[in-house]
Amino acid sequence: MVLLAAVALLVAAGAQENPEAAAGRGRILLVLPFDNRTGQPSLEWIHEAAPEVLSHRLSSAGFAPLSRGDRLYALDHLGLPQGFQPSHASSLKLAQTLDADSIIVGSYRTEGTRIEAQAQIISVPRLQMSQEVTATGELHNLVAVFDSLAWKLTRELDPAFNVAEETFVAAGANVNVEAFEQYIRGITEPDQAERLRHLQAAVKLNSEFSEAWMALAREDYAGQQYEQAAAAFAKVKGNDADSLEAGFYRGLALLFSGEYGKAEGAFAGVARMLPLAPVLNNQAVAISRQGHDATALFRQAESADPNGADYHFNLAVSLKRHGDAAGAQAELAQYMKLKPSDSEAQEMQTAWNAASASSVEPLERIERGFDAVAFRQAAVMLDQMEATRLAALSPDQRAQTLSTQAREYLSRGLLLESERLYQQAIAANDRSEAAHQGLAEVRERTGDTAGARKEAQAALTLQPSAESYLVLARLDMAAKQLDDANHDAGEALKLDPNSRAAKDVLRQLSAMQGAPKQ
């Protein structure tokens, strides 16, 4: 309940200003579409691809880039068309409308099969433009080129940022350019049928493409294709704001499909991270639709947002259904103060006052209006609370907490987010074995073998662990250093006799050496 109240208060305070401004002061970015200088209309889609990649990587790096939706909203607010190409002066006006601290502008050109992207940062308060940064590569490695550019921009924005460039590139390694092109066309196409066609092609080409699944799920949901939407939302494995939003709307899609038990689970998963009134309310509705008593959750939703009229209405209905007539009357009276002209509530009040049975029992109301901006705002507020909590811990406790959080990101394949937290853990306590060991795994996954070996050895110096020995074993096996790999895997098995990973490595080594498998 303390967390619930704290989040509610922070979000209520943040609602008085720009959603990101509450916690991202100095780090709010507006990434504009890049100029197409290729002379090829077929490559115009990269115009929107650039801000999409850069915004995702900058968000993972701890900045608060404004979304494409934010940008389109600001253009509309200024009376400008969606395809408007702003000058530097109009870019500043756009940024000021969105309270952005910096603007990123850029362009791209091709030469043969290669692409070069360049970008600059405009400081809104100082009206200064940075030096140009560039990234080049093969056109079929387009995502990697923009990942590299994102890393260079991050270093310009924060020279102390120490996540490796390889980690940025690895973050987009599973997205091929064909799927990415279909995704970009799917979010920019004005016709819904065409948007669906492109997005379906994107996820067919890459079944692990979370951003494409999210966009497809939104289209299905908007088209009231709730079963398809629920399935698509379940595929989203992005950052916290995206996964929370996906969980919430998956819950709604399941509610509207009559899958009340699954809807309850979806909302409960979101509520564990984000216990806000709309989430708690809908979890309670899903429970109630199964014939169970959800009064306690309805009460929590009302406590989180006392000015939300429907939360009083829902609590009144639940109390009445479960025999608390006086409590129901009191909650209905609170609702009527907020919405005195509601005809359904007026009929309920008349029937309840006359103690007569209503012909149709009212149903609790579903909260539908929690949008992407609200989720980003709430996630930023939670990050702010977490930063305050971490600052109060001792260096050792802070390193342990950050390493645990980083491990969770690593388990989801979010390498950039994971490395950022491991680096923070090492900054808090450079003798944290867990942080060095986790960073070794990140380095291994990004292909930085020297860095992985260095971190694994640092971890072993601090405290021997099976995980660190296994990193060395896999590196040695890949380098055909089979004796060393056998030794490392054997040491891992001594520390953890039940380690399946160590046994697998030993079996692979046995096969490579031509010996019979044990």
Each model region followed by its residue ranges:
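A structural "domain/chain start" motif
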Residues: 14-63, 71-72, 76, 175, ...
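Catalytic-center loop of serine/cysteine hydrolases
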Residues: 52-56, 69-187
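Alpha-helical segment of the N-proximal tetratricopeptide repeat
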Residues: 176-211, 215-224, 373-374, 397-424
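Structural signature of tandem alpha-helical TPR/SEL1-like repeats
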Residues: 190-198, 222-235, 256-269, 289-300, ...
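Residue-level recognition of tetratricopeptide repeat
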Residues: 209, 243, 276-277, 308, ...
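TPR alpha-solenoid repeat register
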Residues: 212, 246, 279-280, 311, ...
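Canonical tetratricopeptide repeat
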Residues: 215, 249, 282-283, 314, ...
